[in-house]
Amino acid sequence: MTNIHHHKILILDFGSQYTQLIARRVREIGVYCELWAWDVTEEQIREFNPTGIILSGGPESTTEANSPRATEYVFNAGVPVLGICYGMQTMAMQLGGLTETSTHREFGYAEVSLQNPTALFADLNDDLTACDPKLDVWMSHGDKVTRLPDNFQITGMTSTCPIAAMSDESRRFYCVQFHPEVTHTKCGQKLLQNFVVDICGCETNWTAENIIEDAVARIKAQVGDDEVILGLSGGVDSSVTALLLHRAIGKNLHCVFVDNGLLRLNEGDQVMEMFGDKFGLNIIRVEAEDRFLEALKGIDEPEAKRKTIGKVFVDVFDDEAKKLTDVKWLAQGTIYPDVIESAASKTGKAHVIKSHHNVGGLPDYMKLGLVEPLRELFKDEVRKIGLALGLPAEMLNRHPFPGPGLGVRVLGEIKKEYCDLLRKADAIFIEELHKADWYYKVSQAFGVFLPVKSVGVMGDGRKYDWVISLRAVETIDFMTAHWANLPYDLLGKISNRIINEVNGISRVVYDISGKPPATIEWE
């Protein structure tokens, strides 16, 4: 079996908003990498034994006292090191160079003129004018290197940054002031490939097939002949987790699907058909709509609704788990960004982002071991694994659906009537987006039930019914988003269908709020 962790890159995070992008780009090249906080120790790096190290960008200034620095071992480990933006500046400072706060900051597009030859820029060239090779790059920096460390040479410059790239070829130390990980840097992926494959000598073994083989082997080694329980939601992460476990241990996997009444139209039946009938998984379906709706009565505050939904899920899951007396392990669809956000970092620092609405809060007395086969994977990698395992692309590429489901898309108190109306309206919206070839052009689309009534006219009579808001956004990272400029005729068709086909809806509106200031979800 291929050792997919034999060659690996360590990325030290100095706080850049792009750091996870670096990791994803390295993985796309076909090489395993991990992202750690910048202040890891020499002992931790030795234990990880990286084939190469990348120092990320960051918001701090190297000219400030007590600004972050890499441990000195980074430069004594005998492996190639690539410094990006702040990573370049701290490498320069730590190796005897000098940085200063620039009077002319560079943010956005820049053109780097290549200078002395370097292995990092081998076969890179975006423009060639009068034998002057140049790169189109993306800059985001205030400080700049003004004096080279010993044995370094300038390999790139811009009109305002005389040292935009530098290298010490003998020690295989490379620095760029720009961000190769962002798509705006045209040759960025090739640059990273030069570093990871050609300079570090990494083999590209990080492929979907190898990851599946490795995950199945590790599951078998971890759980043996024991039985495992998994909360299957039908989402991407739990679905791929289920198929990996099923391939490894077969009927020793018990999936619990909790139908809480807050799912999309026919979603419960679709989950059972897909995983029970098609893939032959052992699934227990728990019809818990009444239990959830009863617990949510009278609750209209969003965070209180989230907590209630999470608590009831744990209670329902716990009740089912008690019936499976031979279960020794709990499986979860934890993915790598969850690990990063939960600060399961090598330094032990905790940065709690928000609680997850899954089985992470199971009672301590259950005493189950934890199986997390996706723990090393980014979301795009999970989708690739899912495709290789036979999951349909349309399911893997569905728009995000919140953990609390319709609980945060029905504003205010949750009632069955409201959920049923929203389910039907949302299904029409999504169906028409597919028909018009707009579904995959937007990043997320859904309906929101507004608990206000509006006067309408149907035939010769007036009616006083509910309002649905449609929301569609375009985004790269979901940190910021633009509302999608859907064609008026498409919006008109969707509105007409909802009002005519969903008895109880008299008005449809379209949300044209960006993020910020609005969030993508209404609650």
Swiss-Prot record:
ATP binds at residues 233-239. Gene3D superfamilies: 3.30.300.10, 3.40.50.880, HUPs (3.40.50.620). InterPro entries: Class_I_gatase-like, GATASE, GMP_synth_C, GMP_synth_GATase, GMP_synthase, GMPS_ATP_PPase_dom, NAD/GMP_synthase, Rossmann-like_a/b/a_fold. One of its GO terms (cellular component) is cytosol. Residues 206-398 form the GMPS ATP-PPase domain. GO terms for molecular function: ATP binding; GMP synthase activity. Residues 8-205 form the Glutamine amidotransferase type-1 domain. The keyword rRNA processing does not apply. It catalyses: XMP + L-glutamine + ATP + H2O = GMP + L-glutamate + AMP + diphosphate + 2 H(+). The active site is at residues 85, 179, 181. It is an enzyme of class 6 (ligase). Keywords: ATP-binding, Glutamine amidotransferase, GMP biosynthesis, Ligase, Nucleotide-binding, Purine biosynthesis. Signal peptide: none annotated. Pathway: Purine metabolism; GMP biosynthesis; GMP from XMP (L-Gln route): step 1/1. Its EC number is 6.3.5.2. NCBIfam families: guaA_Cterm, guaA_Nterm, PRK00074.1. PANTHER family: GMP SYNTHASE [GLUTAMINE-HYDROLYZING], GMP SYNTHASE-RELATED. Catalyzes the synthesis of GMP from XMP. Homodimer. HAMAP family: GMP_synthase (MF_00344). This is GMP synthase [glutamine-hydrolyzing]. It comes from Histophilus somni (strain 2336). The lineage of its organism: Bacteria, Pseudomonadati, Pseudomonadota, Gammaproteobacteria, Pasteurellales.
